[in-house]
């Protein structure tokens, strides 16, 4: 019988290195160099000598995990959360809030200079709010522990898919944070623990709602357990099946939030901004920068449920909102009706494709506002230039795509006149920003 040679796999030990951190990027991630290669490392500060383990090694750069701070920086502070070292939710609690903002602002300017080839003006004052108990929305991971035969609830471990079990979270609104422990106890009483996905907690103006992902069909006994939990905690509870259908299990109210004197209804699964006070200030600033008048027609791209559209409609002659999800368009129309606004129209459209042939896109607009998701709005930027609005406000949750998309406007005859950071997510690497462009 023929014998075939099968080489044995070599076991490689993770590379461990020591280097000095030089700077922070816009995520508040440390950057240093080792043997000429850029090393990105979470949890480290400029000036610190650190020991680290290589996680991902590329030709031009590498990502490393912090193992030891040999020489701490003078501005390093103690994290306020006991789970900080493990939890992937926050990544910058070792840095004072003012230093976090400074790093993000410097990163924002650098991205415009490097990626957009644009020299931005002096940054506007940071729009911020409270740095703790600010989140009105959260998604908790759920994992069935086969060894312990129990369900664990928490957030993903830093740089891992593992779960860090938590009993509370200091950046969550307190009514959400205190729900975590009783929620875990409830889920551990269910027969269908292995079929649980994740859970979302949302604080509406009327109370708390919970959306539980369930990949199977919960038994009647499990349904009864969940309903009893919702009644005891005084919350609304919805189930989301594997096919994305959402079923109200215990519903007492129709959720909404207040904004600029308006009431905006939303449903479980809809996107809403997690930081209510900063959202209010963000909308106020966008309206102030756009300066819509009674004769102006405004285009609001990626409009969602009307977060910017409806406040704009009270200033402008007409606003057209465009959104990619039909359910969100319906919600925006409902919100216009409930607030007595009749000068706003809404359309569903794929804003990741060619929009030139769409009826609304052939209309004339005096002003444009964009608030895209992380991939940005590159596909519509050329059309925005063709519309030739006198001002464009771009609200961004990804400064990389903002800098990229800004190039299109600048090449199309616009100049960047205002730029500022929104501190929507303190203690994290997320950076929200707003830019104003004016036609030359």
Swiss-Prot record:
List of residues binding [4Fe-4S] cluster: 81, 87, 90, 169
InterPro entries for the chain: 23S_rRNA_MeTrfase_RlmD, MeTrfase_TrmA_AS, MeTrfase_TrmA_CS, NA-bd_OB-fold, SAM-dependent_MTases_sf, TRAM_dom, U5_MeTrfase_fam
Catalytic activity: uridine(1939) in 23S rRNA + S-adenosyl-L-methionine = 5-methyluridine(1939) in 23S rRNA + S-adenosyl-L-homocysteine + H(+)
EC number: 2.1.1.190
An example molecular function term from Gene Ontology annotations: iron ion binding
UniProt record, GO biological process: rRNA base methylation
UniProt entry tagged with the keyword Iron: yes
Catalytic site: 397
UniProt entry keywords in alphabetical sequence: 4Fe-4S, Iron, Iron-sulfur, Metal-binding, Methyltransferase, rRNA processing, S-adenosyl-L-methionine, Transferase
Function per UniProt: Catalyzes the formation of 5-methyl-uridine at position 1939 (m5U1939) in 23S rRNA.
Protein known as: 23S rRNA (uracil(1939)-C(5))-methyltransferase RlmD
The organism of origin for this protein: Aeromonas hydrophila subsp. hydrophila (strain ATCC 7966 / DSM 30187 / BCRC 13018 / CCUG 14551 / JCM 1027 / KCTC 2358 / NCIMB 9240 / NCTC 8049)
